[in-house]
């Protein structure tokens, strides 16, 4: 194993560790907070988190073993199962992000009718459709024997070893990426650009009110005026940064892998195996970044994390006080005798 392989193996180990911790923390927050569970987006987040954990436990370790051993890391049946999960979880992850963007679009653009438009029943229906959509492709690939170990990505994933099926496999793979990656990307762009438009409109209204107030307050201190103007500038940039993060992480993580798969199908030029594994690692890194992008940085999840930490530390302090009290009583008893 050369330095490239060692670096890729280290990247996979780090991704597995971060993904387990962050997604596990999101799951604990969902179990702990009834307020979060009552909201429709909790179903999308739960679906995304469980998929990320399953990918972290099954697919990432097999890819790590494939990178280290430079060969198929498991038997044919286990590899086909892992390839089925890899295809299903990739599509499910992308479509779940699209569902979350639709939820935020409805919440921002139609705030008064949001509760009527996005109930838990509606969210459950969207999750069910996501599963059905995502299951279609791996089930088809399983029926056509297009699941197995792919040496270029050191992973159990979509692959076809028969030259006479090259065209059919290329059409199938293109349809899979078009109806998962491209469809989700279009939905993300449409919904978040609508959200950005509404956010900028509200910022303009607030800016007008702020400027009118500053004009009326003649005796206001210059430092207060500067703080108001700085807050106005931050308000304009906040929505743009968030939306850029949502769309940017989606592209950075998934686009290299999707483009590599398509180039592999329609080009005769050889692709370096290290790049293939790196593109797969980038796709896996989405599982590690999703909890921070969609959950843990939000106020409700931060509050739930604080409550969990306080509960843990309070139990420890009570336990330590109890032990101290017991030892103190044991020291006193012999004296009283």
Curated annotation (Swiss-Prot):
In this entry, the parts of the chain located on the Extracellular side of the membrane are 1-10, 69-81, 145-168, 267-276
Q: What are the alphabetically sorted keywords of the record?
A: Cell membrane, Disulfide bond, G-protein coupled receptor, Membrane, Receptor, Transducer, Transmembrane, Transmembrane helix
Disulfide pattern = 79-156
Cytoplasmic face of the membrane: 32-47, 103-123, 190-245, 298-337
**One Gene Ontology molecular-function label:** G protein-coupled receptor activity
- Membrane-crossing segments per the record: 11-31, 48-68, 82-102, 124-144, 169-189, 246-266, 277-297
CDD domains on file: 7tmA_GPR26_GPR78-like (cd15219)
* GO-annotated biological processes: adenylate cyclase-activating G protein-coupled receptor signaling pathway
Q: Which Gene Ontology cellular component terms are annotated?
A: plasma membrane
Free-text tissue specificity from the UniProt record: Detected in extracts of several brain regions including striatum, pons, cerebellum and cortex. Not detected in numerous peripheral tissue extracts, except in testis. In the brain, detected in cortical structures including the anterior cingulate area, posterior cingulate and the frontoparietal, somatosensory and piriform cortices. Prominent also in the olfactory tubercle, the islands of Calleja, ventromedial and posterior nuclei of the hypothalamus, the medial septal nucleus, nucleus of the diagonal band and the ventral tegmental area.
State the family named in the UniProt similarity comment for this chain. Belongs to the G-protein coupled receptor 1 family.
Question: What PANTHER family does this protein map onto?
Answer: G-PROTEIN COUPLED RECEPTOR, G-PROTEIN COUPLED RECEPTOR 26
Write out the function statement from the record.
Orphan receptor. Displays a significant level of constitutive activity. Its effect is mediated by G(s)-alpha protein that stimulate adenylate cyclase, resulting in an elevation of intracellular cAMP.
This one is known as G-protein coupled receptor 26
